[in-house]
Amino acid sequence: MNVDEEIQKLEEEIHRLGSRQTDGSYKVTFGVLFNDDRCANIFEALVGTLRAAKKRKIVAFEGELLLQGVHDKVEITLRPTPPPPQAAAATAASS
């Protein structure tokens, strides 16, 4: 699995384990992700996948490196997905 595939899987798992916020984002704590059996089986290096997703501005969390136990309560936010360009153009045209 390459980095893009791992980030896509991470998004799916945050949707599954997290809670939807009013702005369309999803939040989950690092501890919930790290201790989930399904995530443990999918991600060989969860922290590395999180860092790659943060670098691409797909997720946000405080700090650079998350460690089990120490950072279990750190919230990870999956940013809302912007609408596809066609939908955005249609919305702008109807305004």
Curated annotation (Swiss-Prot):
<feature type="modified residue" description="N-acetylmethionine">
    <location>
        <position position="1"/>
    </location>
</feature>
<dbReference type="InterPro" id="IPR027817">
    <property type="entry name" value="Costars_dom"/>
</dbReference>
<dbReference type="InterPro" id="IPR038095">
    <property type="entry name" value="Costars_sf"/>
</dbReference>
<dbReference type="Pfam" id="PF14705">
    <property type="entry name" value="Costars"/>
</dbReference>
<comment type="similarity">
    <text>Belongs to the costars family.</text>
</comment>
<dbReference type="GO" id="GO:0005829">
    <property type="term" value="C:cytosol"/>
</dbReference>
<keyword id="KW-0007">Acetylation</keyword>
<dbReference type="InterPro" id="IPR044302">
    <property type="entry name" value="Costars"/>
</dbReference>
<protein>
    <recommendedName>
        <fullName>Costars family protein At4g33640</fullName>
    </recommendedName>
</protein>
